[in-house]
Amino acid sequence: MTTGLPSKYRALVLEDHESGFQIKILTTPRPDIGSAVVRISVAGILPYHRDVYDGKRPNSFPTPLVGGFGAIGHVAAVGFDATALKPGQLVYVDCVIRARDDPDSFFLAAIYEGSSNGSKKLMRDVWRDGTFAEYAKVPLENCIPLDETRLCGNLGYSVHDLMYMAYLLVPYGGIRDIQLEHGETIIVCPATGFYGSLGVQIAAVMGARVIAMGRSEEKLAKLVEDVQKGSPGATIETVKITGDKDKDANALRVFGAADAVLDITPKAASMSTHTKSAIKALRRGGRVSLMGSTENIAVPEIMVNNITLKGKMMYERETILHFVKMLERGLFPLSKDFMETKVFSLDDWKAGLDAGAEHNGIGKCVTLAP
């Protein structure tokens, strides 16, 4: 099961916030029961990765650790209990790691240890290291098989561009949780941020009509342009957030009663009125996915119109599998004329983290290639 693994590998190790990253030579991990070792082809870089590791973002995690989060790579070796996963297989390595005996204990690989004692123990003692490395040992269930012939052959996607799926999965988790259907109308708010804009793209690809809310008309126009570049048939309306909840609700109602809302409000905007406006514009029986820091959502329409509110943190494994099916059917534009992927070597990690903070949004992806 471990044939062909080198004795050593290179990894980007964070000793602590003050010392920063260093490239180190580590002993290559061996798979045991319930795990796989993956040869990393590309590791994704998040827009906020730099702030996480600089200590500017209050994410808690143990150190030292290998940085990263998700990745695309080939299985190098598997534990003896693996029945489907095989060496050589292309996989997406997902960052959401859950305790097998307690699904409520979960953390985000190499960026956040979670909030429970169980999740903190699991990260500290078992799955501490991320994917900024030549190899990574990960749970079997976090290796999502990808059809390499279909994706990289028939559809012509590059391995680097496939990393874009890690960004899309977050808003897709909320969209799938409220069971958005083809032809429905969904309000995305706010829509011009990182995950909000990706939520607009996903909903449009799924055949929904999207109403995008944002404070900047210029950014909203650019959002529509970017999404329609990859999906020319996408139906996207825009509504400017004015701060007057009733005025904004009326502006939304111009397009008819909406079926659903995807809310990914950043903490800094948690008291904004846009979520109230969106809820007021829903039809009776409408659904809301709350994926952000919303503290100000109380409106009578929730009760009067039988509105369903569902909180969602990240996504489930089943959601990833369903997303991959859509990806393998060619529903998501990942062509060279749409994708703008920047690739950095492990040695050039600092420039990669800097690029990740600036180069993000629709069709944009930044990766490390160990």
Report residues per predicted region.
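Glycine-rich cofactor phosphate-binding loops and adjacent beta1-alpha1 units
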Residues: 180, 201-204, 211, 224-308
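C-terminal hydrophobic helical "lid"/dimerization subdomain
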Residues: 2-7, 173, 246, 272-276, ...
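Residues in the short beta-alpha loop(s) of Rossmann-like NAD(P)-binding domains
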Residues: 216, 294, 315
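Residue-level marker of beta-strand positions
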Residues: 89-90, 135, 185, 205, ...
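Mid-domain Rossmann-like dinucleotide-binding core that forms the NAD(H)/NADP(H) cofactor-binding site
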Residues: 153-243
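NAD(P)H dinucleotide-binding glycine-rich loop of Rossmann-like/cofactor-binding domains
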Residues: 98-187
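Glycine-rich beta-strand-centered segment in the early N-terminal region that forms part
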Residues: 27-44, 56-107
